[in-house]
Amino acid sequence: MSHRRQTAQEGGQMEGQAACFAREAPAVAVDLLGAHLQVRGVGGRIVETEAYTPDDPASHSFRGPTPRNAAMFGPPGCAYVYLSYGIHLCLNVVCAPGHAVLIRALEPTEGLAQMAARRGTDVARLLCSGPGRIGQALGLTLADDGTAFGTRGFAVRWGAPVAAGEILCGPRIGISRAADMPWRFGLRGSPCLSRRF
């Protein structure tokens, strides 16, 4: 059952928004499909996610809290931003303690010109088709780590739940542990998926 709710872009319904995220990551990862994510006026529709849990060997939270992953153990509904391979900034939404959802792809809807300038391409389907591309297109920095959605220009706008038949599911990408877990989710037919299912 979906726990989606209409939430304010800034402030207002912070408690309700946090409750939407205070669940296990696989459930939140599915519910986030079709929602709109915005960071400082730039964003789009979420079309691909991956779930990570504290008992998951592929998760940053698997060995417990560290200075790097502290946000994963913080309040639900916050951003966990980390540097991947020393190059790409990746955006996750924190759920229950130690749970997070990696945002893998967006269909850009807001701030396309700014995204294109940051990414060096104006091909819409390539602007946010992958976690590293999202980080670049949204202008993320490590200072964004721990930011609560609903503050500092970060927002998730929930829409109507996506029909089960429109949701794709498969193994996660780019990991060597627990690679068979079917915790990658996507919207069927989206041209902006990072990779085919």
UniProtKB/Swiss-Prot annotation:
Q: Which family does it belong to?
A: Belongs to the DNA glycosylase MPG family.
Its EC top class is: hydrolase
Provide the GO biological process annotations.
base-excision repair
A Pfam family annotated for this UniProt entry: Pur_DNA_glyco
EC number, UniProt record? 3.2.2.-
Alphabetical keyword list: DNA damage, DNA repair, Hydrolase
Q: Does the keyword Membrane apply?
A: no
Instruction: Indicate the transmembrane segments per the record.
Output: none
Q: Which NCBIfam families match?
A: 3mg (TIGR00567), PRK00802.1-3 (NF002003)
Q: Which domain of life is it from?
A: Bacteria
User: What PANTHER family does the annotation carry?
Assistant: DNA-3-METHYLADENINE GLYCOSYLASE
What protein am I looking at? Putative 3-methyladenine DNA glycosylase
Q: Name one GO molecular function term.
A: alkylbase DNA N-glycosylase activity
